[in-house]
Structures are given as C-alpha cells and as structure tokens.
Amino acid sequence: MREYKLVVLGSGGVGKSALTVQFVQGIFVEKYDPTIEDSYRKQVEVDAQQCMLEILDTAGTEQFTAMRDLYMKNGQGFALVYSITAQSTFNDLQDLREQILRVKDTDDVPMILVGNKCDLEDERVVGKEQGQNLARQWNNCAFLESSAKSKINVNEIFYDLVRQINRKTPVPGKARKKSSCQLL
C-alpha cells in the first residue's frame, strides 16, 4: 500500500486541525486549542487504490517556524489553508508557498489552496474570486472552499492531493511494458 505524507499549513485559527480531525475521525472540534504539531494516519481508497495517508497538522503560530523546513522537506503534498473570514490569513500564504518551493527546490509541488469556514458566508471578507485568482497565479494550483463544521469539501482536499502526487510520481509497477515471448 502506498503511503502519502500530507502537510496542512496556514495561520493560527484558520481551521487546520478542524479539517484534519473531521477528515480522519469524522467529528467537528468546536474549541480552539492551538496545535504545536499533530500527526494522523488514515487508510482511504482513492480511484480504486488503497492509500495510507500520514497527515501532519502543523502549528499556525509564528513561534514554531523552526520546525517548518523539516516537514516541508518530508511532505509530499501540501494543503495551504486560510479562513474566508480573515484577510490576513489569506495574505500569509504567499510566504508559506514560497518557503515550500524553496525547500523543495522545484515549482512542481502537489498543493491545494483551501478557503476554510465557507459556512460563515455572512462573515466573509475574502471573496471566492480572490482564492481562484491566487490559485491561477500559483501555476493553476488546485483550489477549494471548505467547511469542517458543515463537512463541505473536507475529503476532497486530501483526495485531490493524493491524485496530484499520483500524477507527479505514478505508482511503480502500475504501467508495465507489454512484452512478448517469441519461440524460434
């Protein structure tokens, strides 16, 4: 079974843990409890293939930035999360993306931009078009709006990253050459 190392990044309070826990355990965490770093494992089926996802839920606060390079180096796919209710969380993602590309030393990194808390439409300050435009600027990066509370697009975030990783590095042995045996 293929393993995938996924990393969830973004500012504090955007709902990184809520999205991760909703995906892994199927529950919504109401209380905000800042994360230092949590790791989750979940077996899922994506496109008829069994996958083991290792999801790293990271700290949003600035005090743990020293750990970032390490999990950026080890991660294969990245969910960059902002809250649609806080412009600053959207603005913070450009630096995070640049750091990922620098650590990975490539522009081709499986990544998805996630506008979380889309259930709070009346508190929205970051328009959907802003997210779509940023994703376009980022080499047509995948983009979704989600809600951990309302279970909107939660699974899709992680499944999309798995598909991107599969496209970038296909499963070994899946595309076998056709060979023939000729008897003389």
UniProtKB/Swiss-Prot annotation:
The modification Cysteine methyl ester is found at residue 181. Changing residue 38 to A: Impairs interaction with KRIT1. A lipid is attached at residue 181 (S-geranylgeranyl cysteine). Pfam families: Ras. The modification ADP-ribosylserine is found at residue 39. Keywords: ADP-ribosylation, Cell junction, Cell membrane, Cytoplasm, Disease variant, GTP-binding, Hydrolase, Lipoprotein, Membrane, Methylation, Nucleotide-binding, Phosphoprotein, Prenylation. The keyword Nucleotidyltransferase does not apply. GO terms for biological process: calcium-ion regulated exocytosis; cell population proliferation; cellular response to cAMP; establishment of endothelial barrier; establishment of localization in cell; modification of postsynaptic structure; negative regulation of calcium ion-dependent exocytosis; negative regulation of synaptic vesicle exocytosis. PROSITE patterns: RAS. Belongs to the small GTPase superfamily. Ras family. Heterodimer with RAP1GAP. Interacts with EPAC2. Interacts with SGSM1. Interacts with SGSM2. Interacts with SGSM3. Interacts with KRIT1. Interacts with RAP1GDS1. This is Ras-related protein Rap-1b.
